[in-house]
């Protein structure tokens, strides 16, 4: 676990202790990836918009069947409000995400269909992805990307540091939740039934409506410029 995730776990311990000792009301909520306008991580859906609009190749890890989830920011804000109004949620843990899940290929296809382009798919062989994930394949472009990682001096620790940095860098190519924890082809799906049961909350968006609403915002605001050097080097490795 990196420092960011470790600190969240420590915070949970503090809140649980405050509830047990002082009756301090708290609820722990685990988010999957947030999707929507003004996302503070622009390398997810916003980068995919820009990639497809520019006609760039879309790199697909493995066979593209890995499954993940995103949740729209408006749905998740409504969920947080519902939690704050439901006393039964105190002292409990919940997941918040969208009502559906999709494969990497489905994510790209839905986004491309809305934009009105045919994606140029480039598949990265599983063996290449394994080498990238394990830090055995060095990709120079973007290697200065910063991540808050505990660094030791042993060769194994340096290799692990390299692999974790590459994993987070690759998450700008295809969204991955906690790439420091999950393997590149590990499907990650959250259950939201407990939250729905305890709060009567229900997500309103599916992926298609998330794309439509967020891409409209993207067009209205003019998008942003992206550096494609990392992806270009991956494409060069693939030949």
What kind of feature is each model-predicted range?
Residues 1-13, 42-46, 69-70, 101, ...:
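Short-chain dehydrogenase/reductase
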Residues 11-38:
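Conserved beta-loop-beta element that borders a ligand/cofactor-binding pocket
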Residues 42-48, 61-84, 91-92, 106:
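Substrate-positioning beta->alpha
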Residues 49-61, 114-122:
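A short C-terminal helix-loop "cap" of Rossmann-like NAD(P)-dependent dehydrogenase/epimerase domains
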Residues 67, 184-187:
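Glycine/small-residue-rich pyrophosphate-binding loop that anchors the diphosphate of NDP-sugar donors
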Residues 71, 102, 190, 205:
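Residue-level signal for the nucleotide or nucleotide-sugar donor/cofactor binding architecture
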Residues 82-180, 192-194, 198, 212, ...:
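Mid/C-terminal beta-alpha module of Rossmann-like enzyme folds, strongest
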Residues 206-239:
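Amphipathic terminal alpha-helices
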């Amino acid at each position: 676990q990196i420092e960011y995730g470790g600190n969240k776990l420590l915070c949970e311990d503090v809140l649980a202790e405050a509830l047990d000792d002082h009756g301090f009301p708290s609820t722990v909520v685990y988010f999957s990836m947030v999707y929507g306008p003004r996302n503070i991580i622009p390398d997810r859906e916003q980068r995919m918009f820009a990639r497809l609009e520019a006609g760039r190749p879309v790199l697909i890890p493995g066979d593209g069947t890995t499954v993940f989830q995103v949740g729209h920011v408006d749905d998740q804000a409504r969920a947080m409000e519902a939690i704050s109004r439901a006393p039964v949620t105190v002292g409990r843990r919940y997941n918040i995400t969208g009502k559906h899940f999709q494969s990497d290929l489905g994510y790209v296809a839905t986004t491309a269909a809305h934009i009105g382009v045919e994606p140029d798919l480039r598949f990265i062989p599983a063996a290449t992805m394994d080498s990238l994930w394990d830090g055995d394949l060095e990709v120079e472009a973007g290697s200065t990307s910063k991540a808050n990682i505990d660094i030791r001096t042993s060769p194994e620790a340096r290799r692990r540091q390299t692999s974790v940095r590459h994993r987070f860098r690759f998450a700008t190519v295809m969204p991955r939740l906690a790439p420091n924890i999950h393997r590149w082809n590990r499907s990650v799906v959250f259950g939201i039934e407990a939250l729905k049961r305890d709060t009567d909350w229900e997500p309103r968006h599916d992926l298609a409506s998330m794309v439509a609403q967020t891409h409209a915002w993207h067009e209205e605001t003019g998008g942003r410029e992206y550096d494609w050097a990392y992806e270009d080097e991956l494409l060069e490795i693939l030949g």
